[in-house]
Amino acid sequence: INNELKNGFIVQGSQPSKLYGLPKIHKEGIPMRPVLSMIGSAQYQVAKILERLLKLLVNNPLECKDSFEFVNRILNWNIESDREVMVSFDIVNLFTNIPLNETINLCVKLWDNLVEDKTKSLSSKALRELLEFSTKNVPFIFNEEWFMQTDGIAMGSPLAPLMASIFLHNLEQKFNNFNGELPLFYTRYVDDTFLIFKGEDNVSHFLEFVNGLHPNIKFTFEMENTNKLSFLDVLIERIKDKYQTLINRKPHDTGFYSC
């Protein structure tokens, strides 16, 4: 590690991470989304620096960065068949099911393959040790009791979206092993995926395939209804030979944002 990085990793006056829940008010039963607030912890500072360094490892054309990019992609898609069907896939509890050892190995492998002259900033050995420190065996407090996260990556860690992206990109590279008809259109935002299939009969076969790619990862799906499907905050409608989009607001969306 060079001196600049070493100084950045030094943390003084750190505090433990704290777990809290965010209610998913748009879902039945209002389940809680576990979020680990790591701000102020030693792991948070290390994770922030690693996230900045590892961004260059992520270059996945299947991902969209936001709703605007998704809309641009879908509006430029020309319908190829009158049997086309829109489907959205959602991964069940993605972050807590990411296998840490496997994903850390992927990060180190990509670092070895893509980073030239990497010894100037961070060796592969140091990268592995820092990734393990900032994601594995992370102590946290919940309800005034101490716990330790041993697998999965905490929603609240600066590394969570990046490591999820690297892990899922590795799964997506296995799509070439699918012996059926691949989706005509595929794009993903974190754990939400929008797909267009040539016909409805292709959906179940592909869903079965992706659900067999990794024991930790399970996909659920939603089919279009009356030529319409919601994805992110967008409502997509198929009209003649084009797709059109509208802003889609969830039933509990007030339109206000907290400061």
Indicate residue ranges for each PLM-predicted region.
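Non-catalytic, regulatory and substrate/membrane-recognition segments associated with hydrolase enzymes
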Residues: I1-N76, E84
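A conserved non-catalytic segment of reverse transcriptases
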Residues: E132, F221-C259
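Conserved polymerase palm-domain catalytic core
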Residues: L62-L213, E224-F231, I239
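Short, conserved non-catalytic motifs in the polymerase core
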Residues: E4-K6, Y20-A47, M86-F89, F95, ...
